[in-house]
């Protein structure tokens, strides 16, 4: 494969492109980016055939901030005939054998959504043909590569594969979460997705358990507090604004009407710190650093609002500075991860663990 196809949020192609160029250069793999604003995807075309396979395997998807999903792809298939789109796709996938799953997708744009129904319908005959030809196993297998067919326009598609151990479990990298009817705001979905993304499923019961103590800085009206409460935690909600009455009636929330930047927890038994404040990202990062240096939490989830320009560079600098500050303050064992999640808008979610077990 010669191309690496990366899904991203529409409008963030430039950031995704800058990131993959940087990461490919670290592996000494040459290539160039092809993308258009609002496409919802980025193509990194390698100078050498086969290098895309290396990138798809060696660059961990979870380590990329702006890519939701990626796969190694052949050259763009154009002008697929309406009477037989399957044959050219089969020919392009001839060297992919015994894959475990097929995903026929589109980028996440309003225009592309018009092709969603076609993709669902087209999946059925294509899947059967791939099974008959040996490209796809008779039964789905989560340990085998995933075949991707992405229609970027009518009759135009990129085809390829991703490695199952370095791929999003969700089509196009988008988890479908339901908005709870009693949640105070849609921001609740951001923290819900963050917990699902950053905390392995087999560890969630232990690390997101009932009875834990948490602090939510900038809590009003309680979207993030809601996710902590529904997992059985006791929450110190810090905000000068009002909190949702339903949350307060649970008895699990204590509301501190205070400035989140000046608040100090009265008890130092906090496990989770969460923060979603509309503030300069560098200032929020400095606040989290101060809490970490004081040892006021074990795990933290916080959002950084993004500037309009140089977003990738600014986020990278903030994360690098945070790591340096923690090390300079004798915090040696920590883990920082960052992702532009589906439910994030002009922001990224950062996860910080002190003394991680892995």
UniProtKB/Swiss-Prot annotation:
Active-site residues are: 305 (proton acceptor)
What are the binding positions for S-adenosyl-L-methionine in this chain?
187, 220-223, 239, 259, 276
- Gene behind this protein: rlmM
Name the Gene Ontology biological process terms.
Answer: methylation; rRNA processing
Leader sequence residues: none
Quaternary organization: Monomer.
Task: Choose one Gene Ontology CC annotation of this protein and give it.
Answer: cytoplasm
Q: Which HAMAP family match?
A: 23SrRNA_methyltr_M
The similarity comment for this entry is: Belongs to the class I-like SAM-binding methyltransferase superfamily. RNA methyltransferase RlmE family. RlmM subfamily.
Q: What Pfam families does this protein's entry cite?
A: FtsJ, RlmM_FDX, RLMM_N
Q: Per the UniProt record, which EC number(s) apply here?
A: 2.1.1.186
- Principal localization reads cytoplasm
A single GO molecular-function term is:
S-adenosylmethionine-dependent methyltransferase activity
Record-given protein name: Ribosomal RNA large subunit methyltransferase M
């Amino acid at each position: 494969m010669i191309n690496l196809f990366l899904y991203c949020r529409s409008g963030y192609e430039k950031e995704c492109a800058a990131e993959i160029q940087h990461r490919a250069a670290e592996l000494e793999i040459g290539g160039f980016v092809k993308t258009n604003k609002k496409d919802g995807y980025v193509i990194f075309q390698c100078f050498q055939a086969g290098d895309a396979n290396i990138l798809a395997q060696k660059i961990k998807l979870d380590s990329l901030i702006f890519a939701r999903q990626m796969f190694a792809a052949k050259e763009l298939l154009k002008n697929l005939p309406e009477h037989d789109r399957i044959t050219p796709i089969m020919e392009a996938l001839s060297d992919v054998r015994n894959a475990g799953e097929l995903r026929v997708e589109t980028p996440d744009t309003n225009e592309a959504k018009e092709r969603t129904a076609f993709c669902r319908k087209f999946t059925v005959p294509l899947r059967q043909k791939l099974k008959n030809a040996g490209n796809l196993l008779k039964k789905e297998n989560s340990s085998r590569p995933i075949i991707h067919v992405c229609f970027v326009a009518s009759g135009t598609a990129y085809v390829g594969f991703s490695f199952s151990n370095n791929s999003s479990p969700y089509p196009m990298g988008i988890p479908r979460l339901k908005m709870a009817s009693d949640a105070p705001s849609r921001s609740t979905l951001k923290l819900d997705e963050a917990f699902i993304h950053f905390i392995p499923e087999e560890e969630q019961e232990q690390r997101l358990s009932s009875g834990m103590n948490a602090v939510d800085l900038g809590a009003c009206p309680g979207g993030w507090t809601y996710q902590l409460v529904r997992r059985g935690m006791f929450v110190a909600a810090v905000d000068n604004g009002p909190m949702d009455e339903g949350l307060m009636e649970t008895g699990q929330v204590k509301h501190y009407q205070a400035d989140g930047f000046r608040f100090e927890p009265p008890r130092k038994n906090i496990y989770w710190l969460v923060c979603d404040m509309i503030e300069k990202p560098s200032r929020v990062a400095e606040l989290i650093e101060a809490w970490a240096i004081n040892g006021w939490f074990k795990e933290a989830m916080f959002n950084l609002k993004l500037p309009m320009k140089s977003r990738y560079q600014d986020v990278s600098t903030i994360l690098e500075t945070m790591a340096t500050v923690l090390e300079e303050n004798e915090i040696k064992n920590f883990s920082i991860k960052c992702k532009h999640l589906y439910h994030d808008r002009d922001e990224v979610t950062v996860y910080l663990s002190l003394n991680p077990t892995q």
